[in-house]
Design a protein with these regions (language model features):
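Conserved Rossmann-like nucleotide-cofactor binding loop
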Residues: 14, 118-119, 168, 191
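Asp-based, Mg2+/Mn2+-dependent phosphohydrolase catalytic module
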Residues: 1-4, 126-162, 166-225
Length: 225
């Protein structure tokens, strides 16, 4: 079935305040390892460069190799692992995020379109309540902007609305789908406010200061472009 419109939504810093999650992890690492905890973030950035997405568990595996696991460090490392696995992601949903998903669903199917690993990112989507809110319509890729043919095959539509905090992604998808796409930019998180991105990409079709602002918008008109 080809829908009139399908809504594609990113997760991190679009529906979920991932910057706060990272801040909480940084504080936990510092509490367990002091200044040495910063080595975790060095591995994190290395992996992001290599893989093209944030790999929190992969960075923890690399950080493990830096430690002497014969002592207390082994217990502290498990503490960090439990912190990540048990993190209350639902507490980091942006205000109105689930309500926006419900509102969009009245006009067309809502689909999560995210980058990430195949373990931690799905868990984040599950535990936050997002998975249930979109009825399991979740796609997680390494580079989602390169998987648009798969998106179209799985969720065929005359038009798409992409809601993403990264102007780079919005621009890349607009280059491929053209007028079939309505790009929506929620100005949330560190990517959205990075001055290096100012004027670098084409202006999104719609810009909102926070995801919850979509509750005040006419979704039918938004989908029509």
């Amino acid at each position: 079935m080809t829908h009139d419109v399908v809504f594609l939504l990113d997760v991190d810093n679009t529906l979920l305040d991932n910057d706060r999650i990272a801040d909480d992890l940084r504080a936990h690492l510092t509490g367990q390892f002091g200044a040495a905890g910063e080595r975790y973030w060095a591995h994190f950035e290395e992996l992001r460069e290599e893989l093209g997405y944030a790999d929190y568990l992969g960075a923890l595996q690399r950080y493990r190799a830096d430690l002497d696991e014969n002592g207390e460090a082994a217990h502290r490392l498990l503490s960090v692992s439990q912190f990540l696995i048990d993190y209350p992601f639902a507490d980091r949903l942006y205000p109105g995020a689930l309500e926006v998903l419900q509102k969009l669903a009245k006009t067309g199917p809502t689909v999560i379109l995210s980058d990430g690993d195949v373990v931690f990112q799905p868990r984040k989507v599950h535990r936050s309540g997002i998975w249930k809110a979109v009825e399991g319509r979740v796609l997680i890729f390494i580079h989602k902007e390169e998987m648009l043919a798969t998106v179209q095959r799985e969720y065929p539509a005359k038009r798409y609305v992409l809601i993403d905090d990264k102007e780079r992604i919005l621009d890349a998808v607009k280059n491929i789908w053209g007028e079939r796409l309505v790009s929506v930019f929620p100005r949330q998180g560190h990517y959205a406010h990075d001055p290096k991105n100012a004027g670098k990409y084409r202006k999104p079709d719609v810009t909102v200061e926070r995801i919850g602002d979509l509750m005040e918008m006419d979704i039918g008109a938004l989908a029509a472009g």
